[in-house]
Structure formats: structure tokens, C-alpha cells
UniProtKB/Swiss-Prot annotation:
Keyword DNA damage: yes
Organism: Homo sapiens (Human)
InterPro entries, per the entry: C1-like_sf, Ssl1-like, TFIIH_C1-like_dom, TFIIH_SSL1/p44, VWF_A, vWFA_dom_sf, Znf_C2H2_type, Znf_RING/FYVE/PHD
A GO-annotated cellular component: transcription factor TFIIH core complex
Function according to Swiss-Prot or TrEMBL: Component of the general transcription and DNA repair factor IIH (TFIIH) core complex, which is involved in general and transcription-coupled nucleotide excision repair (NER) of damaged DNA and, when complexed to CAK, in RNA transcription by RNA polymerase II. In NER, TFIIH acts by opening DNA around the lesion to allow the excision of the damaged oligonucleotide and its replacement by a new DNA fragment. In transcription, TFIIH has an essential role in transcription initiation.
VWFA domain span: 60-236
Tissue expr: Widely expressed, with higher expression in skeletal muscle.
Protein name per the record: General transcription factor IIH subunit 2
Result for mutant: residue 345 to A: No effect on the transcriptional activity of the reconstituted TFIIH complex
The keyword Nucleotide-binding appears for this protein: no
Modified-residue entries (Phosphotyrosine), positions: 95
The entry's keywords: DNA damage, DNA repair, Host-virus interaction, Metal-binding, Nucleus, Phosphoprotein, Transcription, Transcription regulation, Zinc, Zinc-finger
GO molecular function, one term: zinc ion binding
Record's subcellular location: Nucleus
Amino acid sequence: MDEEPERTKRWEGGYERTWEILKEDESGSLKATIEDILFKAKRKRVFEHHGQVRLGMMRHLYVVVDGSRTMEDQDLKPNRLTCTLKLLEYFVEEYFDQNPISQIGIIVTKSKRAEKLTELSGNPRKHITSLKKAVDMTCHGEPSLYNSLSIAMQTLKHMPGHTSREVLIIFSSLTTCDPSNIYDLIKTLKAAKIRVSVIGLSAEVRVCTVLARETGGTYHVILDESHYKELLTHHVSPPPASSSSECSLIRMGFPQHTIASLSDQDAKPSFSMAHLDGNTEPGLTLGGYFCPQCRAKYCELPVECKICGLTLVSAPHLARSYHHLFPLDAFQEIPLEEYNGERFCYGCQGELKDQHVYVCAVCQNVFCVDCDVFVHDSLHCCPGCIHKIPAPSGV
């Protein structure tokens, strides 16, 4: 038997001559190289925002989870299913934190079938509870991309034109068992303006590549658990909207939270409309959010009124969605030895010890790398610009 020629396979390219990346400092330590790699990873997401482009702010997303027998593989610990469900709990929390006026639903596919784990909803606690219960789910059979996408499309095609229609598939298997030609379904999805993205857990699959390319989505295959989490995080921010999507004014209601007690003689107990589609038994309560149009009561916001269809939100919900449209500009990176100002971070008041500091171009305040990442990822506004006190006009 002839020996296999010594050439690097394409998938091994990232591991070729890895020792050349590591460089020793004057004392022979590799710490500086490792810190530089971690530093670049921290700064990477700061530059990944879309800039001032048109975004789909009101999102409707279905997450399709592969429940086939391949999800029992233990290359992710303790297995693919448990790891996926834990990361999806994190994803749901981040999704609603960054997109409070959006909705999400979960579909599971196994044994050549697909079924909804949760309906399209804006209640994160409902989804997280279902994900926790799904840990005991039995994985068997093959997945069906066709059936999963058909179920998602049945709901998404009726969504208003000004909202984004998205599907995110977590695909573990290398095969799909479909009852009909999936390429015809891909054309239908494209015509319905449904964007489909795929995260692969095994290897690249041709049909997933075509699906993502034709519908305008993305397709990535994970390297490890940390990369898996990073790929999920990419789907938290709203995608750029197509130029053909509708523009329209949306009626919204801003109900105030009414607090009543048993001692209040005018208070009248009432049922919450949110219990109509829930498994919990409805109960009479005093307080809540009352729709300004039809006076229907709800326990939490945001929600679409089941009586009159009005979208009920609070002002902070819109404010948290607004920052996607006008993202904070990246701070200017300056070597520490070239910076002549105070050597303390404006955000955490810690001493600046890193090789680089970050200066806001507007208020000229300086930040460390951790505060820079926190400001751009979570705060979305410069604390120096907010607290900048203008000089009195008489001076």
C-alpha cells in the first residue's frame, strides 16, 4: 500500500506551523503573545456593527433545533443537545435584551418530522422554561429540513412586511429526510423574503450552503463551544433589511402600570389576557398593564393586544432597540506611551496598564479595553459624552 503523500488537508490548514504564532519576549515568556490574542478577540466585535444602514428592528425569528440521534455525540460536553440548549438559553436572554419588541419561536426536528416547542412569542421566560424541560428529550432518527422550514414558513409568511422574517437552524446531522424537493421550497422561502441562517455542528452540508445563499442568510460550522457561542451572538443584532421591504408607521400603545391594593375600594379584580394561551390557570388580579385602546389587561410588556391588535410597549423598549440604528462610533486606539493625559480609565477609574488606550473622538475621555468593550456591547453610549457638562453661557 502506497504511503499517503505528506500534504496538508484543507481543514488542517488552520493548525499548520502553529508555533510560528507564538513569540517569546525578552524574558522568554509567551504571556505577551497570549495577551495579544485575547486583546484582539475583545476588540473584534467593536468593529462588527453594520454602521448606519437600514435594519429590521421588529424581528420574527424561528430557531430550528436538530433533535436527531447525532445530538447525542459527545464532542461538545456533556453532549451536543445539552450544550445547545444551554447556549440557547443565553441566546434567548440576549436576543430579548437587544430586541425587546421582537418575537421568537422554537421548532424541534427528529424522526423525519418537525414540531413546535414554543409558539412565536415575546415572552423570554416561556422559551427558557421550555428549553430547560427539553434537556430530557430523547434524540433519535433523522432531521427534516423541509418539514421544519414548512412549519416556520406557515407562520412567518403572514407577518407584516415591515418586520424581518428569519429562521436560524442548529443542524447537527449530515443528512436530511424530506418528503419533497427542498430546492422548490427554497425558492418559495426566497419569494416570501424569509432569511434562513444555519449553524452546523458537524461539517458543511451542500443543501445548507444553497439554503443560506439563496435566502440571504449565513452558514457557519462551529470549531468548539466558545466559537459556537460566538456564532449565536452574531444573530442577536438585527440583520440589514432589504431595500424592497415595506416602510410604514406602526401604531403602538404605551400603557402605564397600574398598582392597586385590596384596601382600595375602587379597585376591581380582573383576568389577564396573557393567560388565554397559557397552561397556567387564570387568576383574578388587581394591577397590571391596561391597553389604552380597549382596556384589556396584561401582566407584562411588550405584547400584542389579543383584542384590538395594538402593539403594547414601554419607552425603554424602544430606546433599547434604537441604538442599533445609530451605533456608537469605535473609540480611537492610541499607544499608551503616546498618550499625555491622565493614566486612569474614565469608566472604571482603574490605572491604565495595557499597551493601548481608547479615546472617544467627541468628549476626548480615555478608556481601558474592558470598558471600551462594555460601552460598545452593552451600554451603547459614551458615559463621558452623557456627563459632559456644558460651560455656563455667562462665562
